[in-house]
UniProtKB/Swiss-Prot annotation:
Keywords: Cell cycle, Cell division, Chromosome partition, Cytoplasm, DNA integration, DNA recombination, DNA-binding
Gene3D superfamilies the record matches: 1.10.150.130, Intergrase catalytic core (1.10.443.10)
Protein source organism: Pseudomonas fluorescens (strain ATCC BAA-477 / NRRL B-23932 / Pf-5)
Record-linked NCBIfam families: PRK00283.1, recomb_XerC
Name recorded for this polypeptide: Tyrosine recombinase XerC
Family stated for the protein in its record: Belongs to the 'phage' integrase family. XerC subfamily.
Amino acid sequence: MQQQLDAYCAHLRSERQVSPHTLQAYRRDLEKVLGFCEKMQVRSWTDLDIQGLRSLIARLHQQGQSSRSLARLLSAVRGLYHYLNREGLCTHDPANGLAPPKGERRLPKTLDTDRTLQLLDGAVEDDFLAHRDQAILELFYSCGLRLSELTSLNLDQLDLADGLVQVHGKGSKTRVLPVGKKARSALEQWLPLRALSNPPDGALFVSQKGRRLGPRAIQLRVKAAGERELGQNLHPHMLRHSFASHLLESSQDLRAVQELLGHSDIKTTQIYTHLDFQHLAAVYDSAHPRAKRNKGGE
């Protein structure tokens, strides 16, 4: 068994040309399987069956191995058996149909409402960068936008009169979102300054030279605001998570939050229900802590 394992690793190195890091990880995983086989007196790769491999996976899971690590181990086993089958040394694959135990999904990091208001209610200096960055922060939180969605926004997608923004999301799906009062005010402060930079295209958020801000530039501005106002690391998706969590906590309307976020599967939205946690515009108007829009169409 050791010879065949060594031959497979040599095949990965010379023919598949996998990286040293990947090769080391695969060998380490397969050595675990080999050690298990020796303890269970499984004397050849042909004798390892699905029940035996399932027993190993269960044992490793109980010892604290993550689902991700176990998935990699199963991938290594499948690769080994694909090689053994191709070489005529085996006729089955014990990993076929096996999946690692499901791990707990990591919960999104959010700001609570007080911390969010602390971030957004800080004093704004009267200059180009300050007004632009404030508009970016307010729009992220007001609409729960993805970084890619905000980066790609053009001026003609914004309707301040009606308080709406058209967003092009994942899968070429378009959704129209309400823009809260605070975000509208910040945008109204920003747009005259934007015009002074003479942007050559319709980008909503631009540099002082009129060029569209890229994702990295926006990430850095959000990070700087987090460090300045909150003394913590902040990234755009944390504002999206906070938007979703705060709305869901107040409204308990999972479907509305799903549509506002642009999630195709409600299971993706359900991750926010951990925060203890009317349609769309009504939920937005009544629940969002910074989006109370005046009646009568301000």
